[in-house]
Amino acid sequence: MTVFSVQSTIFSRASVALLSSNGFKRFSFVSSFSSSAAYSPPKMRKRRYPIVSAVDIGGVAIARNDVVREDDPTNNVPDSIFSKLGMQLHRRDKHPIGILKNAIYDYFDSNYSNKFEKFEDLSPIVTTKQNFDDVLVPADHVSRSLNDTYYVDSQTVLRCHTSAHQAELLRKGHSRFLVTGDVYRRDSIDSTHYPVFHQMEGFCVFSPEDWNGSGKDSTLYAAEDLKKCLEGLARHLFGSVEMRWVDTYFPFTNPSFELEIYFKEDWLEVLGCGVTEQVILKQSGLENNVAWAFGLGLERLAMVLFDIPDIRFFWSSDERFTSQFGKGELGVKFKPYSKYPPCYKDISFWISDLFTENNFCEVVRGIAGDLVEEVKLIDQFTNKKKGLTSHCYRIVFRSMERSLTDEEVNDLQSKVRDEVQKKLNVELR
């Protein structure tokens, strides 16, 4: 198995000067973006200890101040997110994410004599051009908002999808490849959502000699090859299962599809895919070619394959979790250990026009980290006389490793109450 690493420009031009002082030389098919909302630039952050001062990405040390910038009004990367950079769960062979990645690699290695190149160490810090423009995300798309995406500066983001590397790899002459990596999105808090998760992108380019003589046009040829490939992958992972294709829309493929399988008496969406929009190929000097692409979320599939009930488990270092995957193989079913009791706390406040739930979740997560299991809106009403709207959220605190004390939870809740007033311009009730 050959895994490649390609050097790429990981910061925007606006960031280069800052990085040089530290020794630097210079779409998504999965999990649709949340709805658009206004964003209130973050105020000066309180440091919460311990704080990671630097991380290693592809052999390059990146300092905290390169990514978490209190003096930049467009920067919305908290320390809790910076600490996840460089952890690369997908490169751990005895971790559920790494096990699943390797199983997918095995499928492609076994079924394609013309091997797919593998890239899994590309920096998650990319330009807005790479993350949005190169994959045809419209200028007014909600995914570009500060409410949905982590911005390092106005031209640099933490990638929202592994598709951010697609154009760069095509321009460098790669035509069949798999890209795996950690991706970042501001999101809600519950058992299936986390601001950092892992994706795999697959891409395959065809030349005219591939489809000439088949009796099919280039688009149909690519679409049929894509479906054959992914149906085989689904059988490789899930066994003999019923499947169905659903037509859908992505800005970077046409036609576009979702593959669903009938698993445990329900239809499960496995991945999104499609025939690549011709303009993407043309911009990479491949105007005479056709291609297909797919993207899948590794956590989503791993939770199903390994029976993992909460996405936070993937980040756990508890031996009761990690030891269950020591063989590095599919087929293991997670055996839950004692589930510690939840602690419920409610918070109510009058919201402003700039309020968004993603911003609120970021505040809660920044304080409680993985001790918060869920944040849920349980009530809202509008006072017509005052012209104000109130939201009431229930925060569920629960550790996966120990029982939380009342004192701990009360302290966390108190900090949440203080911070939401300072950062979100809301009035507590």
Curated annotation (Swiss-Prot):
E.C. designation(s): 6.1.1.20
Keywords noted in UniProt: Acetylation, Aminoacyl-tRNA synthetase, ATP-binding, Chloroplast, Ligase, Mitochondrion, Nucleotide-binding, Plastid, Protein biosynthesis, Transit peptide
Boundaries of every FDX-ACB domain copy: 338-429
Binding residues for substrate: 163-166, 185, 192-194, 199-201, 269, 294
Name of the top EC class for this enzyme: ligase
Functional summary from the UniProt entry: Is responsible for the charging of tRNA(Phe) with phenylalanine in mitochondrial translation.
Protein name, entry field: Phenylalanine--tRNA ligase, chloroplastic/mitochondrial
Lineage summary: Eukaryota, Viridiplantae, Streptophyta, Embryophyta, Tracheophyta
